[in-house]
């Protein structure tokens, strides 16, 4: 059995369509403008390795020598119980937004925690991916009618990576 992205699942496994939602181009561009203007909370750094600098807009890791902007981002807005701001990266130069909406990005299959939230932006479930199969966790969360969206975060640093929604 295949989903719309062509991923093969065993016949006994249900497939649920989902959409990957990377950081918006508007937010990435605003971060670039703030860094260019010298905002103290928008730091421009140069990647010194191929790991450790994941762009939340194109959903790929920066290569050594690429310039990145490190800035605070709140995936859940202030005033909500689960509101939190944390550091994320985007490329300093414009990059193409990740567009494979029905396909989980290969670069982020390991070391992630998945958090399901309801329509009031309250966390209702969470699970760490063991191995490199996030799809069953995503599908389990999205099968719950109370789940409005899922956030994907780094296990080691807790940083926001992307959002996943039901199609």
Residue ranges: model-predicted function:
Residues 160-167:
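C-terminal edge-of-domain segments
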Residues 155-159:
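Short Gly/Ser/Thr- and Asp/Glu-enriched loop/turn motifs at secondary-structure junctions
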